[in-house]
Amino acid sequence: LALTIYLQFLSPNALLTQGQALPHPTVFANALFMAGDNTPTPMMVQYLGLKAKAGDCLLFYRMGDFFELFFDDARAAAATLDIALTSRGEHDGKPIPMCGVPVHAAEGYLARLIKAGHRVAIAEQTESPDQAKARVGKTLVTRDIVRFVTAGTLTEDSLLDSWASNMLVAVAPVGEFFGIAAADISTGYFELVTVTGGALEAELARLSASELVVPDGFAELPGAILRPRADFDSVVGGDVLRQHFALNTLDSIGPITRAEQAAAGGLISYLAHAGQGKMPFLKLPVRREVHEHLLIDQATRDSLEINSASKGGRTGSLLAEVDRTITGAGARQLAADLAAPLMDKAKIDARLSLVQWFHDAPLTRDAVRAALRQLPDIARALGRVVAGRGSPRDLGQIRDGLDAARALRERLGAMADRPELLDQLLPALDGHGHIVDLLARALVTSPPTDTTQGGYIAEGYDAALDMLRVAGRDGRQAIAQLEARYRDMTGISALKIRHNAVLGYFVEVPAKHGDALMAAGTGFTHRQTMAGAVRFNSPELHEEAVRITQAGGHALAAEAAHLEELMALILSRRDPIATSADALARIDVSAALAERAAQSNWCRPNFVAHPCLEIEGGRHPVVESALAKSGDRFIANDCKLSPEKRLWLVSGPNMGGKSTFLRQNALIVLLAQAGSYVPATSARLGLVDRLFSRVGASDNLARGRSTFMVEMVETAAILAQATERSFVILDEVGRGTSTYDGLAIAWAVVEGIHETNRCRCLFATHYHELTRLADSLDALSLHHVRAKEYKGDLVLLHELADGPADRSYGIAVAKLAGLPPQVVARASAVLAKLEKGRVETGGLAAGLGDLPLFSAAIDAAEAKVDALREKLTDLDIDALSPRAALDLLYELKRAAGET
């Protein structure tokens, strides 16, 4: 019944084909859909059963040397991979779409499919054709799904970015809390955290998940993979954790919450499903608390371009500008540091002290960075080994990495005045001498990835293996001698002994000499006739071929056995090896930050207890670097926020540098709490618990939000979440609507930040009227970016000065941008009239200075000239008699009631 339903689901009208057949054998595909009476063949039944198991994943169905895809999977894959869509067999009289990729090149195709958002199920042959034939009455090779390849479960180098972590994240709602379990299985990193709804978005933004898994029915995170709710049961999750890590109690992890147990259970269950029973490497999970790091929501990350630029990609981001790491592990650690700056002053200072140690010792720094260049990616090689996807090359990388770590340990251990953090890291680089020495003896210098051809176990490691190899070499030498003898014997100089996977060894002669060797008594047996050649066998050749094959087979088996032993050794030492990889990454990051600081004369920030932000000579690292490439100099500016003056209102012309000033101070805070030097002459600050940026605007049409709506949503989040220890930058709040509405909103937001949130804030605006708030808000300070006009042209100085801007220079900026002269002239005339009207009537600013804090909006009716007011205005009180006055009073009261 299920098969019938599935076949009906595959609409015949939709099965259209195009393109040419791929150049590979078609016998398997023809066998799949060959029944003329529309009855599915056994192979079709097998395929459809596996497809049902694969669900919404594309099914890579192994057929010989190719992975084949059929029906809708074929159409989707062909479109994504830009490969030919062909057809094999029929269903309901219509050709069935098919495409395929070679097994040996599958990783490249998988990478493109995963990047396009697909998930792939790999169905491999689980027995050989000979094994299938040995089963009575069955010749169909058994296949099964051996792995699901998804964005969050990748371990192969070709499918991963070496500089970026690859996070799989599971979220479990339990009561009012959300448990988050996050893992990078390529390195074994595993963390748990519990958050409330208000911090969920910021935590997910920090983790930047490649794949998100949630329980079925949880609709708050669109795009997440839905998994059975039973996988997210907190009791089951606790049992799963204990079983996976062989723990008697979860106390060794820490005070783990029910929400974290539920999320961990969901994540581990998904990994078991993806690996079809083969579990990847997971370290014992690290418990995190939300208050341990600076909270940054997604809007702020996008605005500040922390890990990626606004146009996508790494170029132009803060990470790209700061990153001077040598190793992939170091690059990933730096990205993690910038994504989650610390809130612990002691830990920040420990990082800064190590950076300073490298900064102040350039020769040591250069030597360490040179040593790091010899390091392979130990963490990811270890991850593949633990996941059962390791190769001899991975073992070689672990060997070389641990050997380099040992040498680095000796060098750094001999240095004087080491900082405390370095002393904590160095012991992790020791203790692997036995592994390094064993792998050095066992493996060749550059082991291959492919094991099918052997050659990765070094000579001298196993005497028996060496003898098998000698036998194979002797056999090949004997065949070369046999070839020379056959040439002399037959007189055919073009005779050759060749080898292929189908025939093995054979004698080949040009077609014109074929008859001579076919004659009786020659000792040759005909094997194959080609267009231009004839192939033969001989008893002597067969005997040598058997010897070579047997020796080669035994040698491959011996190498495989040694490889398994070496893999088991690495598995037994996986935790200390992973710890070494982490230590090397931290050393790389520290030396890299020191290098970056030395390149641009950055300074070490100083943290104090009270909430201040005192920056002298602050610069925007990305903008400064871009200007330097064109030979221009960045204008540094100071910022001094204190409890007494914690809110700066910054005005001035467009292009004057307001947004850059705002962003550079936010980036300085972020870098400082990440443990980095900062682009400034000096920096003194109190810890920031939340960082908010409302700079720039864009539509979110997919979610039905205009530019102004996006601005208001982000501003609302800031007003709701910012605390007294937060740092907020706001740029042009209210510009997306009418002048009156925008000014009113900006006015109220400034008051709210000042009176309710009471946080450190930089607020840039073009509303000159806001400067009147300085008269009523004690902690507000006025500043502006300087500009001047010279011979009719605007000169932007990019310097910050005290006090409000005298005017906005908007028309001058428009002229600078190239607006037509007649448009600029007309704008100047209109502006003159508007400013004259404002002077005469009080205009836009009339009465604003008298507004009390948080006053209710003035009723729109009061702004209108109504009938009641007109009547009172026209009234001549002296001309009224007492009776007329009384009647008028009743009339006015009645009119007021109707109003």
Regions found by a protein language model. Name each.
Residues 7-10, 25:
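Short hydrophobic targeting helices and cationic amphipathic motifs
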